[in-house]
A protein has these predicted regions:
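Acidic/histidine-rich catalytic neighborhood of metal-dependent amide-processing enzymes
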Residues: 262-265, 290-348
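Metal-dependent peptidase/peptidase-like ectodomains
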Residues: 123-128, 225-228, 235-236, 333-348
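Soluble metallo-hydrolase cores and metallopeptidase-like ectodomains found primarily
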Residues: 127-160, 215-296, 307, 314, ...
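Second-shell loop/turn segments in exported
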Residues: 30-37, 51-60, 97-99, 136-140, ...
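Noncatalytic luminal/extracellular "stalk/propeptide" segments of secretory-pathway proteins
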Residues: 22-23, 48, 52-167
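Bacterial N-terminal signal peptides
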Residues: 7-15
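Sec/Tat-exported extracytoplasmic proteins
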Residues: 38, 42, 47, 51-61, ...
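Extracellular/luminal Protease-associated
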Residues: 20, 60, 123-226, 297, ...
């Protein structure tokens, strides 16, 4: 019996060792060439450029990022480099998805005012588009409003508004602006929203109360409005003052809005060498849109596949790597909706 057990262990361990010594998927010279050529520094330089832009769908910032990616692809020797454009007009249907119009902002500031003998004057700036674009919620519309702030808790249920007059005022809410606007603005007549919505309600939520989360409003709302985003730390201070009965007067100035534009989708290929298999494609895709500041979601992914494209193209051109049998395609769309647009407009 002992001999059988020992024999089984030998077979089992032999299998584990054999599995651990499994040869790599690629020949060692190819792996070495890829490791030598791939550059984290090059990827980081591209990331630094992308992260400078507030890259919302159809915006000037997104277009600048798309042109940078396309320019780099051409410089790296990729084929079929182009920026595909599809209407983002609020009307065109792509399958079951209605295109959202493009959105851009020129200016936005939120100030707390101080009362003086001559009237209310600016005292503390709470948010600035120029300093931090993420403080203006996406799909905000132009406004110039001076109004009192009212705390409405989450702002998503009728009980949040019980006994409170928010008409013509600016509400402070913990939920996303899009979830607050239906009651606060459309039903109860609030002039605008200040939100301190968190990225998610569990896990690390609240660990860093200085963070400002991206916010958004409903694109197709019948009653356009504006919203600013503030940190949890700032919101707590405002809530405490309001709870003590202090009057907080704000002035919000926004120059922003939706307009007909385009979904820009950057694409390029490394053509396959096989006449038959070359018609098939292996796709690398990362969404190019994101807010500024921020580099992880998903500028880091965008520059990662850009560096893959550069590395493969260079090694193939130098004869150090065989051209793949199938075509390799690289795609940089707006997140989700840009992919839906591309697949519906270009089903092939």
């Amino acid at each position: 019996v002992n001999r059988k057990i020992i024999g089984c262990l030998v077979v089992l361990l032999s299998g584990i060792v054999a599995y651990g010594q499994k040869p790599p998927l690629l020949p060692e010279p190819v792996v070495a060439a890829l490791a030598q050529e791939t550059s984290g520094e090059t990827a980081k330089r591209n990331l630094e450029y992308l992260a400078r832009h507030h890259r919302m769908r159809g915006s000037r910032g997104f277009r600048a990022a798309a042109e940078h990616i396309a320019g780099q692809l051409r410089a790296y020797g990729l084929s079929d480099v182009r920026i595909e454009q599809f209407p983002a007009d609020g009307k065109t249907m792509y399958g079951t998805q209605k295109a959202r119009p493009a959105w851009d902002a020129e200016f936005a500031e939120l100030w707390e005012l101080r009362e003086t003998a001559s009237g209310w004057v600016p005292n503390v700036r709470l948010a600035s588009w120029d300093a931090m674009p993420i403080t203006l919620a996406q799909d905000s519309e132009s406004a110039d409003v001076t109004a009192e702030m009212v705390d409405v808790g989450s702002g998503t249920s009728e009980r949040d508004y019980a006994g409170k007059d928010v008409r013509g005022k600016i509400v402070l809410a913990s939920a996303q602006p899009g979830a607050v606007a239906q009651l606060a603005v459309e039903r109860f007549g609030a002039a605008g929203i200040v939100s301190y919505a968190q990225n998610q309600p569990t896990a690390w939520s609240g660990d860093n109360d200085n963070l400002v989360r991206w916010g958004h409003l409903e694109t197709f709302s019948d009653k356009p409005t504006f919203a600013f985003m503030v940190s949890l730390k700032h919101a707590r201070a405002l809530r405490e003052r309001l709870a003590r009965g202090e009057k907080i007067q704000l002035r919000a100035v926004v120059r922003a809005g939706r307009h007909p534009g385009f979904y820009d989708v950057v694409t390029a290929t490394i053509p396959g060498a096989d006449p038959r298999l070359g018609e098939e494609e292996i796709a690398f895709s990362c969404h190019l849109d994101h807010q500024r500041p921020g580099s992880n979601d998903n500028a880091s992914g965008c520059v990662a596949i850009l560096e893959v494209a550069r590395t493969l193209s260079k090694l193939i051109a130098e004869g150090r790597l065989a051209r793949p049998a199938r075509t390799v395609r690289f795609i940089w769309p707006p997140e989700i909706e840009g992919t839906v647009v591309l697949l519906n407009a270009r089903p092939d």
